[in-house]
Amino acid sequence: MATTAAALSCLRTHAPKARPQVALLLGSGWGGVTSHLVDSERFPYANLPGFPQASVAGHAGELWLGRIGAVEVAVLSGRQHGYETGAVDGMAVPLRTLHALGCKFLVQTNAAGSLNADMGPGSLMLVADHINMVQRSPLVGATGSERFVGMADAYDRSLRLAARQVANRLGVKLFEGVYLWCLGPQFETPAEIRAFRALGADAVGMSTVPETILARHAGMRVLALSLITNLAAGMSGEQLSHALTLAQAQLASDKASRLLAAIVSSLSLAGDGSAAP
């Protein structure tokens, strides 16, 4: 917590007027949303105590403070994945810092593989629930009763409704499904994909779940969106690679960023922390 306090002090010193209400966490293909920011300031993670050094292509490693529409936001452009260090709490300090700065909502994004043949590359999926296949938690070592976090409504129903309404208004098709977290960095085998489908998963990726757990532990309400970059292993003739993920993510980046910015700017945030479309 001392590191969180140091990061918070740094931000309050260099951005004393910042009062973000919504935290955004951007995965591969979603970086274009920063072009929708106004009155923005940028802080490299390297300049913020306890913030991780993102080592994966497509993750800038920068915090932006600004506005999207009338909503003050804090944008985490890039995350640290569990496979980079072996630890799954790499985003703990950034998320706790932004919560302390005033963020009551986390809108996070990722690039994912599809287990649904009808949901091909370039599709967007609203995360309704997740499966923690890694069976690890970023809360290990936490104390107090707050560590026993209920996850029955991990992805906020009213925020999902707002997202669907915005997508309908923009004419953007938005799938909804279950995201399954694998540690990586290797891609899944065809046999694993068949097993995951039997478990009820619709998309698979290497992030998002730890950050959702951290946000719910802090009391933040969560919305998550997946940009589908490929059909999962064994579902097509493609050889999966990170380069393919980045290339496919770039193709749909404009659509994804436009939808995300519209969702955030449409939120009506009341003083009591409620949100409505």
Task: Please provide the spans of the model-predicted regions.
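Metabolite-binding pocket within alpha/beta catalytic cores that recognizes anionic/polar moieties
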Residues: 1-151
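Non-catalytic positions within long, well-ordered alpha-helices that form the structural scaffold/packing
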Residues: 99-102, 197, 216
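Short acidic/polar active-site loop segments enriched in Thr and Asp
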Residues: 104-105, 202, 221
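Zn-dependent metallopeptidase/amidohydrolase metal-coordination segment
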Residues: 206-244
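Generic non-transmembrane alpha-helical segments
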Residues: 10, 14-17, 158, 162-172, ...
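His/Asp/Glu-rich mid-to-C-terminal helical/loop segments that flank catalytic regions of hydrolases
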Residues: 233-277
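Active-site/ligand-binding-proximal alpha/beta "capping" segment
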Residues: 165-202, 267-268
